[in-house]
Amino acid sequence: KGNQARKAGAKEEILFLISQKNIVERWQNFIEHKEAGKRVAHHDTKISNVLFDETEKGICVIDLDTVMPGFFISDVGDMLRTYICPVSEEEKDLDKIFVRNEFIQAIQDGYFTEMKQCLSQFEQDHFLFSGEFLMYMQALRFLTDYLNNDIYYGKKYETHNLLRAQNQVQLLKEFQVNL
């Protein structure tokens, strides 16, 4: 299925994502583990869904239509995916994609300050996996949309979703180097 010409042009990304199937296996093991609990989650904690005051202090998360039961991985993973890189998923220059390790530490410290007592040790041990999983998932979603002729996310230009997928693949690679 999918657009064959686009498939040929996205071969490198397809092969990379297939090579990362261990992420899916780790996700499956996580959700089946007795210490992985479901709780209320936002499921879209990207930086553009955080409301800041005039001093740039975070006030609250907005866009609440995605709130439902889920695993902490969804919220933490999207925070890591969108906060640790200085550029967004829209960035065309892949050389600008890198991981700010101090942001990873700040997210972990801040999250654990408020939530550590709510997480099992098993969940705490999967904190960084959450970023890896969400980067992988978002790359896969952008690539799937590109291969299916941009029916979900839409596009501003012909290769928009391919570029978004490439962006997230690059971020995932950078993140994995830092694990």
Predicted regions and their residues:
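ATP-dependent phospho-/nucleotidyl transfer catalytic cores
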Residues: 1-42, 47-55, 133, 151-156, ...
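A structural signal for short hydrophobic/aromatic patches embedded in well-ordered alpha helices
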Residues: 17, 107, 126-127
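Catalytic activation segment of kinase domains across protein kinase-like and atypical kinase folds
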Residues: 48-88
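Transmembrane helix-bundle signature of multi-pass membrane transporters/permeases
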Residues: 68, 130-134
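Active-site activation/catalytic loop segments of kinase-like enzymes and analogous catalytic loops
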Residues: 73-117, 133-152
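All-alpha amphipathic helical-bundle segments outside canonical DNA-binding/catalytic cores
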Residues: 119-131
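Helical subdomain adjoining the active site within ATP-dependent kinase catalytic cores
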Residues: 141-179
